[in-house]
Amino acid sequence: KPAEKKPAEKTPVAEKAPAEKKPKAGKKLPKDAAAGDKKKKRSKKAVETYKIYIFKVLKQVHPDIGISSKAMGIMNSFINDIFEKLAQEASRLARYNKKPTITSREIQTAVRLVLPGELAKHAVSEGTKAVTKFTSS
């Protein structure tokens, strides 16, 4: 029976060693999966973010200040949320007025409804300026 106990003790040790090696094997799996993707020639869809634009605005406002990647992620989520709210409101306005198209007028009204007070006024003026610049060029 002592001989039976010793192999029983060794098996947990043997089980622990592969358990430690599993994360390494796990790291190798994505490489194998990536190789599989290369064989299929499936291109990865580019994730669209506003990070470069947020950074450009930050440098215009505060050239000496940086931003962490976590804060950048939060800002990107914030922009996505605001745009989603504006799109939903503009869509609702177009539906109410039985219009098939969302125009700059619907966007402007959505901005006035979604954004509070002074922020809405500034957003409308900047939006009007951008549309004028776009149509003139």
Curated annotation (Swiss-Prot):
Conditions for induction: By gibberellins GA1, GA3, GA4 and GA9.
Q: Which UniProt keywords apply?
A: Acetylation, Chromosome, DNA-binding, Isopeptide bond, Nucleosome core, Nucleus, Ubl conjugation
Q: Which residues carry this modification: N6-acetyllysine?
A: K27, K28
Q: Where is this cross-link: Glycyl lysine isopeptide (Lys-Gly) (interchain with G-Cter in ubiquitin)?
A: K133
PTM summary: Can be acetylated to formH2BK33ac and H2BK34ac.
The Basic and acidic residues compositionally biased stretches are 1-37
Task: List GO molecular-function terms, semicolon-separated.
Answer: DNA binding; protein heterodimerization activity; structural constituent of chromatin
Q: Where is the region Disordered?
A: 1-45
Instruction: Give its localization.
Output: Nucleus; Chromosome
- Which InterPro entries does this chain map to? Histone-fold (IPR009072), Histone_H2A/H2B/H3 (IPR007125), Histone_H2B (IPR000558), HISTONE_H2B_site (IPR055333)
A single GO cellular-component term from the record reads: nucleus
Name the CDD domains for this protein: HFD_H2B
Q: In which tissues is it expressed?
A: Ubiquitous. Highest level in shoots, fruits and young flower buds, including petals, anthers and ovules.
The record's comment on protein family reads: Belongs to the histone H2B family.
Assembly, per entry: The nucleosome is a histone octamer containing two molecules each of H2A, H2B, H3 and H4 assembled in one H3-H4 heterotetramer and two H2A-H2B heterodimers. The octamer wraps approximately 147 bp of DNA.
Family annotation (PANTHER family): HISTONE H2B
Instruction: Describe the task this protein carries out.
Output: Core component of nucleosome. Nucleosomes wrap and compact DNA into chromatin, limiting DNA accessibility to the cellular machineries which require DNA as a template. Histones thereby play a central role in transcription regulation, DNA repair, DNA replication and chromosomal stability. DNA accessibility is regulated via a complex set of post-translational modifications of histones, also called histone code, and nucleosome remodeling.
Q: What is this protein called?
A: Histone H2B.3
- Look up and give the organism this protein is from: Solanum lycopersicum (Tomato)
Q: What is the lineage of its organism?
A: Eukaryota, Viridiplantae, Streptophyta, Embryophyta, Tracheophyta
Q: Which gene produces this protein?
A: H2B-3
